[in-house]
């Protein structure tokens, strides 16, 4: 289908959804509207978030970084100037006893595991999730946590305006950049909060890359970590794993221990070279199985086989931090077999303590391999948005379905995919990876919670228009339909020589499809999509409204009947953490409190 025809379909869709005279101001993960003029600062939380949003959105910050790629080092110097204007010096950050973590996949989970382990030792923890890594699920204050809890709206508001006024008072009219962008402001604010709260340690997640990330003004972390590497943000970090590894290794510091998980040979060699250049002791984490040997198996609070590597890295980071701070009870060393094939020395193999075990078990990370059961509906939520993370998501979904109680062949079950992908990522490879899950329905919608006006500043987005997001959903549907056509001719189950980790190796056991076949639908917002999927069977969701908000599709009514009669409905929500956050907000309204 041509792009022009897609635009015409989007226009018809808008006409169907919004009657004449209705203003299409849309609520979403962030609201779609023209950027408002900054208002006089108030003292309410929503006022603070609106003003924060006016500084710049992530997308415009990334565009600025791309324009200035030849002058990257200047960005760190600029960040140091902002820090000084805020009333702090780089040396002040030393007292935060920082654990600095980068990586492409799993760095957020690694940080969550690490923070939970150390909190179990009675330590007061700070945790900062950089805006460059992933979007916040519901509220921006989730990014700054004390003892695992987001700072309260009152504390966020107080710290925001204090920092904002300091920066306003120190503006230089001759400078081309008078206020820090969204990324930088939140990073500065986190440092101020952690210092004022007198945390024992701060776990700081890198936003994008490492070498030139705004968090890399940290000069003396206690320990650094690098989670699994992959291809992402190529316009900023480079288009090869080696180039990306060079950027990630930029957080290494002289004499500061660093740990990484197994990586491909090329990127691992780059990390080793980066470490050697600045005399940073870099260690390779042994697998979790080595720490479990002779011990009860470790239970992880985050599901998915891929979380074991993140947990192994977190254990090493936590133990190293405790050791360097002269804490007792850090786990007895165990004998280990040295590997002659490693490019790096192996990190210690030790016996995890009860604090470590309970920390791993009790870790929670909403929106990542998360399962919610609501009567006959089970929601599988994972914000995977790269090929490698979607592969891991499919493995997790497959394992979860295999673990569920088996129902007889006469009991109908339905599988639904709810998907969206944003930015400049190509959705086709992601959708192809999801195909083997054998979904009965593929549902596409923008990252908009509902179609209505809102005053919720946490969900504002100034970077895209309604036409753009709906057109992208239609393109997702077209990709899915083409995959349907391809699957109709060759035998999907007899692909010779499946590539390790590729789609064929992720196939679920074949099952007979429902009589209605596979169908795809497009909705105008998350709320309408959830209403159609749940068909009134989830008491916390509204009864389905008229299907006029649907892009016209002949299976809308028959699909609703199938969903109402199914004994079990399994819904995988993936492709965008914004989408997952919007779904969670509707399924669990307490997250907005």
Regions found by a protein language model. Name each.
Residues 1-105, 109-110, 115-121:
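N-terminal leader/targeting and accessory segments in enzymes
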Residues 3-4, 11, 16, 21-31, ...:
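Acidic, Mg2+-coordinating active-site environments of NTP-dependent enzymes
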Residues 40, 60-72, 76, 80-98, ...:
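ATP-dependent carboxylate-amine ligase catalytic core
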Residues 199-200, 566-568:
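Short, high-confidence coil segments that cap the C-terminus of an alpha-helix
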Residues 201-204, 214-225, 229-230, 295-441:
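Nucleotide phosphate-binding/pyrophosphate-handling subdomain across enzymes
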Residues 264-270, 274, 379, 387, ...:
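C-terminal helical cap/extension that packs against the catalytic core
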Residues 576:
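Active-site-proximal loop/hinge segments that shape catalytic or ion-binding/gating pockets
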Residues 581-593:
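Active-site-adjacent alpha-helix immediately C-terminal to a catalytic or transition-state-stabilizing loop
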